[in-house]
Each structure stands twice: as structure tokens, then as C-alpha cells.
Amino acid sequence: MTAPTVPADQHGHPLPGPADPAANDTWRPSRYREPLHPDNEEVLEQAAYQAAVTRSSGDDRKRKIKPRRTVDYQGGVQKWRMLNKLKGVHEFRPAIHPNPSDIVNFLPPVALRSNPSTSICDYWVHTSINKERSPTRVVRWTPDARRLLTGNDKGQFTLWNGASFNYESITQVHDDSIRSFTYSHNGQALVSADKGGTIKYFTPHLTNIHGFQGHREACHDVSWSPNDERFVTCGDDGLVKIWSYREAKEERSLSGHGWDVRCVDWHPTKGLIVSGSKDMLVKFWDPRTGKDLSTLHSSKSTINTCRWSPDGHLVATAGQDSVIRLFDIRTFRELEVLKGHEKEVNCIEWHPIHHSLLVSGDALGTINYFSLLSPTPSTPITTLSAAHEDAVFSLSFHPLGHILCSGSKDFTARFWCRARPPGGQEFDKWHLTEEGAAQKELERITKREWGTNAPPANAAGGGGGGGGDKQQVALPGLSNLVAAVNSVKTGPTTTGGGPSGLPGLGAPNVHAGTPPSRVSTPSSMGPPGPGAQGQAQGGQFPRGRSALPSQNDMLRHNHGSRGGFADRDRNGGGDRGGMDRDRDSRGGRQDPRGNQMYGRGPGGPPPGPPPGQGGYNYPPAPPNYPPYPPSSYPPPPNNQPGYPPAPNYAMPPGPGAPPQSYPYNRPPQGPPQNNNPGGQGNYGASASGGYGQYGGGGGGGGGGGYGRDGRR
């Protein structure tokens, strides 16, 4: 069979084209490729954003997207309405946990009328800077509370979003500095005044509908009447003028001030006007007759601002003397003088819900909160010392009362909200377990009370009675927390692992009234005393008196003090600390042989503490270490069970009298051991404890009584 002929050129090279027509039906890949996947939408959006930034800026600089910060602009109204609609839970208030997600459980101030402190807006949220570098003279929330309107020294209105606080629009409305503007009570009109004395009308959409010359000089303040039919203005011409809004005509001019009138305010419900002037006078006017009803002469400087309280009973005035004066119109007397500012006070604002809460701003940039329900209403309850970098000119609360806005000379308007649940480092039991959360709280309180000299809060130490190796976490919130966990293992036979006492209940060497800075730490307490070995078994340090009595102190009238648990002893404070089970004297009971045993219980006192048998005195201080502090407790009454007798006490012998000698034959005594008189088990470093003769009542702080063989 003849092979097919391959077409070739004159040089013998094959011509293009398959020799076999069937070769066109076979596809042979030149290289292997992965199937194409569409790009992620997020990647496409980011690329589109970067392209738009490049086109707008003309360069290739990469800019980061910064999300807007939004607070609880609804003030918890939705949550509150839901709770009100549920039957039986209208008084229910959800708990706020330390988690940012719990912000949904915030309720509006109107739901918390009984607690004004929940409406203090001291948490900074956002700073809005004017587009034009000009001081912000006035800040006011719009009637719908969705936006904030500010006026500056260049005669411009600026709108800011009330939720994200970003800039929305700016409008030139005056030819001079805007000094005041206010919305009517029904929210349908806006009246503004400037430094040139011009008064203008605006719609809620900031459309100028009318303007006229109201004062010959600067107009400083504007206030509406309760029915929105009239408004009142004041100016540097020394006049207070009442205007008809519909006719835009002056109805009455109130003259009586001898200098510039800086502020004016109409009573919220009645026909009464208050004004303050540079002549240091506060005047009350009747708008129907134009007469001066009363004049207050308390101030000794210029009056910068005056405001009626929302209930209309009080009026607050402030000026260059840096104090705020409260007057009660029912008596026309000064009620209180609020101090706390260092410079002149420029603005005052009452809380719209809590009428006892007042906020003020001064020329130093400080914002102070005052509460008339406070035990000391003359001092601020909250101070924002650096709220602004320059003088604060205006303050305005959100109608719900959960956000405060402040305008300043530093060209900014700053927003403040209520304190929110903390985030970032959760200290709850769901993140750190219960012991971890308690440990974190303990470390926080330790650092607060001890500062940089705080010992480690998790230091393990020997405790009375062999408590095992499990770490005991102190209870947070009590006093003397650090002393409860400060522990250092002392002695060669330390076996205990528990804490030395509950916080505030028997902390070592902490006396009543001792400040945290004076509490002895393990590094400053010195080496143990003569009973170091017994001390290490029953507790690592001698327990001094604390701010609260210990459990042993409270129960020692009824029971012998129980030290730790050793091998076989119930009352011994350490290894073989007391008697055996057949000889322990727990609180002065009869022993099996019929003899009366006197422990630290109600069995009655012995005729006196023999040397080395335990007494009520403190042990001698070790050399080169500070002596034990004197006791702050009063001396115990005479003949009280469990306490030592008086120095000259002598009970006549007879039936029922305490024995004058040992009920058993004393064991043979060796050479005298030069032992110091031991202290009581709970108060001394000696190994002897209590008043039991054969192991009675070993102390929790030291070894208990006699050993099992009857010797010390």
C-alpha cells in the first residue's frame, strides 16, 4: 500500500496544512489552564473605589476607608416601647453587661427618671470641624432631632447629621457673626440674630423668608414665648424688645438696664421674662405691661447667660465671676451658688428630662455637670476638664437627653453621649471563667490601692490546716484584698496551701483604720518569731486585728478556736498541734477522767496565764524589726469567758472554782527553756495558743496549745 504524499515546496519543506484531512477533527491543547473564576464582589468594589480616588485626586496614593461612628441615636426608644407593650414587665429594666452589644439594652432617659446620673453625657463621640475656620457660636438640635444646626462668626449655618455626625450642608445666611438663633416650640419657624443687630426669619428647611433691623447694636439672645406668637430679643443698646412674629413688628421695649444686655429668656409656661446685663443686674419683667417686677443684685460681675429650668421654678444665671447662681421665683431669693469653674461661665443648659441636672461651659474649655439632688449641689458631680481647646460658647441637649453637643471657639462642635459598656477586654466569666474574672478584678483593685508596689495577686502561701493545692480566689469588692492573698512559705515543713484569710476578714497585720499604703507586705514583715514551725503549719503569719472581726473572734465564746486540720488533731493549728482525739479540750468540757478542762470556750478562765502557756499580750518583737502596732480594740470586760482575768483577780477556792494546779501529775520537766510568754493563738507568733491546758483551742495563726505528749 502506498503512503500518502505530503505536499512540499521546491526545497522539500512540507507546506502548511494537514496531510490527513481527519486531523482537523482532533483538538490538542497547547498548554494546561485553570478554569476562569469571576472576581469577588468585594474586590471589584475596592478596585472601583481606588479608581475613583485616583481619578479625583490625580495621583496613585492609596487611601483607607474610615467608617463613620454611630451611637445610640434612637436612645433606646425601640427597646423601651417594646418593654412597655409587654404586659407585666413595664417596670423591667434590662441589666447592662460589659459588652458593646449590650448597647441595644440602653433605655432613654425618660425611662430612668428616678436616676439622673444615668443621663450624664461625658463620653466623647465625635468632633465636627467647621469647613470655614471660624468659632462656633451657637449649636441647636433641629425639631426632628435628626440633625444639628450650628452658626459661626462668618454668618453661616452648618448642618450636621445627628447619627453619624458628618457634614451635610453649609449656607450663608448673615453678613455678620451669628450670636443666637432658636426654633419655635412647634418647630415651624426659626429666628436668628447677628452681631449687627439684624433679625431674620427662616423655615425649618433654612429658607430665608424675612429680615429686618432689630437693634442698633449687636443682638445677643433670642427667646420664644410659650405660644410661639411672640419672641424677645436683647442687645448692646441696653434694651429688651418684644416682637410679634406674624407682623414682624416691635410690640414693647423694656428699658431699665444701664449697660449692654447679654442674655434674655422667656418663662416656659408663663408671661415672665428674665434678663441679665453687663451692669451686674438680673431683672424680671412682665411682658404685658413692660414693668420691672424685681431686680437681683447678688452678682458682682457681668451676667453672660440666664436660663429657666424646664419646670419654670428656678432660674440659673452665670457670668464673669465663674459661679452659677440659682434663684427660686416663688420666693425671689437665691437658692444655691454652684462653684467649680475657674474662668467666666459662658453658657448654661438644663437637661430636658431630668430637671435637676444642669450643665455649664466656661472660657477655659471646661464642661461641668451639677445635680441639685446631690448631697453637695454646689460642687460638680462630673467635670470634663479639657472638653475643648478654647472657650465653650454654646451647649445643647438632644430632645431625648442622651446626647450633648458643645460649640467652642476652637472651630469645632463636639458630641458627647452617655457612658457605654466597655469593649475590647472583657472581664466576664464567659471569657475568663469565674475564677479568671475574679482574678482580673482582684488585680485591678490591687493596682488601684497599692500602685506600683502591688505584690503578685496569685502568690500561693501556706494556710492553716492544709487546705490543699487548689488556688483560692479572694472575693472582689471587699477591703484589704491584697493582704488576703499575700503569702510567702515560711519554715521547713510548710504543708498548707490555702489563703491566710478572707479579704477584710482576718487579713494579716491589718488593723482597723489602717490605709492600704500602711498594710505590711510579706517583704516588710521580717522573719517569723519563735514559733515559726508551728506558725507555718497553722498559717504563715500571725493574724493581727483587721477592720472586721475574724470568724474565730466571733465564735470564740462558744467554741474553742480551731486551728487547721493535721494528721489526727481536730483543734491543733499544725502538725500534732493540739491533743489527740481522746484528750482535746474544745471550749472547756469535761475530759474522760472527770476533770474540768479549760479551753478558750465557756469553761471559765484560769487564775492567770503562767509563763509560756499563752496569754493575751503580743509576743516580743523580733530584733531589728518594727514592733507590733498597738491594738485599736477596747480592753475586754473582766471575767468574760474566753478572756484573761484582771491583773489582781483571785477567785476564792471552793466548789466550782477553777483549779489552782494541773489536774494530772505534771510530766517531768527538763531544764528550763527560755521561752517568752506566748501570745494568744490568733494574735501571736508563739506556738502556744489559748488557755487549754492539754491542747485546748489551738489558734489559727499559730500552733495550737500542747503537743500530743503534753509538752510544748
Swiss-Prot record:
Residues 533-545 have a biased composition (Low complexity). Coiled coil: none annotated. Pfam families: WD40. GO terms for biological process: chromosome segregation; mRNA 3'-end processing. Residues 603-612, 619-671 have a biased composition (Pro residues). Residues 460-469, 494-504, 678-712 have a biased composition (Gly residues). Residues 565-592 have a biased composition (Basic and acidic residues). Keywords: Chromosome partition, mRNA processing, Nucleus, Repeat, WD repeat. It is found in: Nucleus. Disulfide bonds: none annotated. Required for 3'-end cleavage and polyadenylation of pre-mRNAs. Also involved in chromosome segregation where it has a role in chromosome attachment to the mitotic spindle. This is Polyadenylation factor subunit 2. It comes from Cryptococcus neoformans var. neoformans serotype D (strain JEC21 / ATCC MYA-565). The gene is PFS2.
